[in-house]
Structures are given as structure tokens and as C-alpha cells.
Amino acid sequence: MLRSTVSKASLKICRHFHRESIPYDKTIKNLLLPKDTKVIFQGFTGKQGTFHASISQEYGTNVVGGTNPKKAGQTHLGQPVFASVKDAIKETGATASAIFVPPPIAAAAIKESIEAEIPLAVCITEGIPQHDMLYIAEMLQTQDKTRLVGPNCPGIINPATKVRIGIQPPKIFQAGKIGIISRSGTLTYEAVQQTTKTDLGQSLVIGMGGDAFPGTDFIDALKLFLEDETTEGIIMLGEIGGKAEIEAAQFLKEYNFSRSKPMPVASFIAGTVAGQMKGVRMGHSGAIVEGSGTDAESKKQALRDVGVAVVESPGYLGQALLDQFAKFK
């Protein structure tokens, strides 16, 4: 477990550590996943690392190796195993890392990626101590080389370039024009299914994860999507807890819906019933109703007020986007 001394003031800053312009903002572009992305796996030879590295290889992702200090010098899935991320980058030119290691050492694995200055680190691990992630948040905000997705997330995938870094089921994805950002893994797949079914497809799908200190949040993804030439519409999937969706609504009001031709945005917010259970954590560490603005109804209303098409069931996301495309045509 990582140790750091963190004040209450630092805690407040880190919960929203990339709202102001800081060096870390420069790494948002690292989320794009071009075809030449070279991926390594931390925890490469473990059961989950092996399983998902193999699926990514079959999908078309360029997996160039991985790390396991105890097996450095060996070959796994036809690729070399290295002692460290730094060694892997030096030998393979890796530009992204998928982190599949147990919770007690996951923050240390993220720290290693940051120190090695790999452009993109995607941490799938659930159950990382929040104090450890607060330490990582402080590291991230002072550097401009590494972008983190997660932890506790399904990962990130670009169907057009066939770059998959995570645990997503590849068969449901279709290259297209909708950018998806989600706090929930299963809701992500429902949104993907909806956009595939309506033939809208996906440009980039980011699972930000449900923990309290995500490396990439809604506004980071929205900044990327609004400037990305391959993205023409957005799906935002939120849930109870925190005020990230409220902040995203204000961002969309200022930077999207004020445009002469806004980008269509649809959203689903999970946890309507949970709003009656204040102070109770619902699954994710960040999914807890703490007061005004953190419940599902407040978030849905904030999004509706700025022009987002908010649906009551994820099964309506595809049609909601089609309606928005017609509206803004």
C-alpha cells in the first residue's frame, strides 16, 4: 500500500483535480488510440492478464509484451516479458499499458507507469484503497506525460483502429460516430449495443470507472469528443454519488449547446431508487448519495436543463440519439 500525508484541503482539490487548467490536461489527447498504439500488460502472465491480452490480440490490438519481475526474459503469448514498464518501453516502444494486478499493489503499478512516462495507463483493478488513489491523483496533476483511465473500469476501446485495452466483449462493438463515457461497465455495454443496433456505431468508448478518484472523468472525455473529427454524438452514463454529472452538464451548456450546431448528447443516470437511501454505498466506492446534487434526479434534471436527452431506461439511448440528430440537423 502506498503511503502519503494528505490534508483535507488536498482531498478537496484531488476530487476535482483537473477542473482548472493544469499540466495533466495535456494528456487528454492520449485517449485517442490510433492504429499504431503499442500495448503492454502489467500482470501479463497472470490469469486475467493472459486471458484479456489474448482477446485483445485476436481483436487486432498490437500487444507487444508485458511485465512480471519474476519472469523477465521469458516469452508469453508470443511476446517478451520484462522486469519493469521502463524496460518494456525501451525495448518495444510501448505507448499504453493495461494494468491487471491485485488491489494491494495496483497503485504501485500505476505509479510505475507514471514514472516511466507511458502515454496511457488503463487500470482495470477494483478495490484499490482510496487513500492509495488519492496519492496517485496528486501524482497525476503535476505531470503532463501519462493519462490514466480507471481504476475499477472496463477500459477503453476504439472499434475503428481495433485497439482494445480492457475487458470489453469485442463482438458488440461497431466502428462509427458516437463517443461513449461511462461510470458503469455493464451500462457501457448496453449503450454500445444500442448504438450498434441503430447503426450509429462508436468512435471511442471510455469506461471511467466508479471509484471516487478516476484518472479520467466526464469533462475530460467531453473535451476530447467535442474536438474529435470522428465523433458526431455523445452518450454519457452516470450514477448516484458525487457531482461529476452536474459539472458535466454545465460544461456542455457552455461549450456544446451554445454552438450554432450542437453535438447530440444522450444520457442515462442509474440509481433513481437508491436516492432514497442516503449515506449507503451502492456498489462502486463513488456511488453514494451524500446530499443535494448527488442523487439521480438532481443529475437528470441538470442534464435536461442544458439540452441533453435524458432517458429513463438505457434501452432508449439509441433512439434518443437519433431524435437528437434529427433535431440538430
Curated annotation (Swiss-Prot):
PROSITE patterns: SUCCINYL_COA_LIG_1, SUCCINYL_COA_LIG_2
Catalytic site: H284
Record-listed substrate binding positions: Y189
Catalytic activity: succinate + ATP + CoA = succinyl-CoA + ADP + phosphate
Induction of synthesis: Induced during growth on nonfermentable carbon sources and repressed during growth on glucose.
GO cellular component, one term: mitochondrial nucleoid
Gene3D superfamilies tied to this protein: NAD(P)-binding Rossmann-like Domain (3.40.50.720), Succinyl-CoA synthetase domains (3.40.50.261)
UniProt entry tagged with the keyword Mitochondrion: yes
One GO MF term attached to the UniProt entry: nucleotide binding
Keyword terms, alphabetized: Ligase, Mitochondrion, Nucleotide-binding, Transit peptide, Tricarboxylic acid cycle
Keyword Ligase: yes
UniProt pathway: Carbohydrate metabolism; tricarboxylic acid cycle; succinate from succinyl-CoA (ligase route): step 1/1
Transit peptide: 1-24
SUPFAM superfamilies in the cross-refs: NAD(P)-binding Rossmann-fold domains, Succinyl-CoA synthetase domains
Pfam (any one): Ligase_CoA
Enzyme kind, highest EC tier: ligase
EC number: 6.2.1.5
GO biological process, one term: tricarboxylic acid cycle
Cell compartment(s), UniProt: Mitochondrion
Residues holding CoA: T45, G46, K47, Q48, K71, I124, T125, E126
Function: Succinyl-CoA synthetase functions in the citric acid cycle (TCA), coupling the hydrolysis of succinyl-CoA to the synthesis of ATP and thus represents the only step of substrate-level phosphorylation in the TCA. The alpha subunit of the enzyme binds the substrates coenzyme A and phosphate, while succinate binding and nucleotide specificity is provided by the beta subunit.
Misc. remarks from the entry: Present with 18400 molecules/cell in log phase SD medium.
Subunit details: Heterodimer of an alpha and a beta subunit.
UniProt record similarity statement: Belongs to the succinate/malate CoA ligase alpha subunit family.
Protein name, entry field: Succinate--CoA ligase [ADP-forming] subunit alpha, mitochondrial
Species of the source: Saccharomyces cerevisiae (strain ATCC 204508 / S288c) (Baker's yeast)
